[in-house]
Amino acid sequence: MDYWWSESGLRFECAACGRCCGGSPGVVWTTPAERANIAKELGIDAMAFREKYMVRLEGKCSLIELENYDCIFLERNSARCKIYKVRPLQCRLFPFWPSLLTDQNGWNYYANFCQGMNQGKLYLPEILNKFLNLPAARYL
C-alpha cells in the first residue's frame, strides 16, 4: 500500500520535550510483559504495580494519567521518563504508530505539538513499513 511518505520517508528527531507524554488526554497501552518489566524496575510486585500505576480501559491496561494529563512516569521539570529503560512499546514507537503512519492528517496534528516531527533524521520508507508491520504495533 502506498502512503504519503512512500517515496520520501519521514523525518523525526526526538527533542526530549516530553510533549508526547503529557499535556493532553491519552492512553498508554501495556502488555503483561511490559508491566512485569516496569514493576521489576520499580522494585515492586506486579499486584502493587497494577494498583498504583494502572487503569483498565476498553478491556486493556493503560498507565494512569495525572490530572494535568501527564503520564504518571513523566518528570515534568526535566521532561524525562522515570521508566525510560523499560518504557512500553507504544512509547518506544512514537511517532511511528500505525494510526499516524496511515493518516497524514493525524501525523500533521501531532506535529503541531511534537517539535521533533518533520525534523532531523530521515526514516526511509523501508523502515517505516517495518514499523507499520510490527505484529505488536497493530494493538497501538
Model-derived regions, located:
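Short loop/turn segments that flank or connect secondary-structure elements
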Residues: M1-L140
